[in-house]
C-alpha cells in the first residue's frame, strides 16, 4: 500500500487500482476531470484554508463552523446572537454579505516540474538553483494560458521534487 498524499490529477493509472482494492466505489474520473463534472467541482476551498461542499445548483455551500466563525461573529449583535441562536435567511434578500471572504474552485492541476526545474542541473550553488526556480515559477505564473478571471498558483510537492500548477476560479460574493 502506498502512503502519503495522492494528487487528484494523478489518480488515473497511478492510484486508482489500489484505491479500488481498498473499497473505493467511484472512478478516478469521478474524483478529478477537467472535461466533465467531478468531485473537484463540488469541494472548493473556503477562505483559503477550509474545505467546503457545494450542495445546490444555486451555489449553497457548507463548511465547518470554525471556518466561518469570524463572519458569524461579525454579524452578531446583543439582539441577534447568531453564534448562540444561529441564523436562517428565508430569501436571498435576507442573506448577509461577508467582505473579504472567498470560495475557490480548482479548474485544473498540471505537472510543471520540467518547466520549473529547467536549467537547474547546470547550476552549482543552492542559491543559484533557488533563484532560477523562483524565476521559472514567476514566468510560468505570468505566461500560463488561462481565462482573465482565473488565477494560477504553483505548489511544490515531495520536498521540491515535483511542482504542480493549479488553475483556480474564486468567488467573492459569499453570504
Locations of the language-model features?
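Terminal presequence/propeptide segments associated with secretion/organelle targeting
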Residues: 1-175
Amino acid at each position: 500500500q502506498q502512503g502519503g498524499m495522492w494528487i487528484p490529477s494523478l489518480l488515473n493509472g497511478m492510484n486508482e487500482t489500489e484505491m479500488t482494492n481498498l473499497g473505493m466505489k467511484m472512478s478516478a474520473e469521478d474524483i478529478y476531470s477537467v472535461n466533465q463534472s467531478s468531485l473537484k467541482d463540488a469541494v472548493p476551498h473556503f477562505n483559503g484554508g477550509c474545505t467546503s461542499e457545494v450542495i445546490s445548483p444555486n451555489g449553497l455551500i457548507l463548511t465547518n463552523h470554525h471556518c466561518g466563525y469570524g463572519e458569524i461573529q461579525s454579524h452578531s449583535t446583543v439582539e441577534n446572537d447568531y453564534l448562540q441562536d444561529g441564523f436562517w435567511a428565508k430569501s436571498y434578500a435576507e442573506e448577509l454579505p461577508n467582505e473579504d471572504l472567498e470560495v475557490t474552485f480548482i479548474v485544473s492541476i498540471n505537472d510543471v516540474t520540467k518547466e520549473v526545474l529547467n536549467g537547474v542541473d547546470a547550476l552549482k550553488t543552492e542559491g543559484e538553483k533557488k533563484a532560477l526556480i523562483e524565476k521559472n515559477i514567476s514566468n510560468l505564473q505570468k505566461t500560463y494560458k488561462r481565462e482573465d478571471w482565473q488565477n494560477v498558483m504553483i505548489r511544490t510537492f515531495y520536498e521540491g521534487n515535483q511542482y504542480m500548477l493549479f488553475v483556480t476560479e474564486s468567488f467573492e460574493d459569499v453570504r
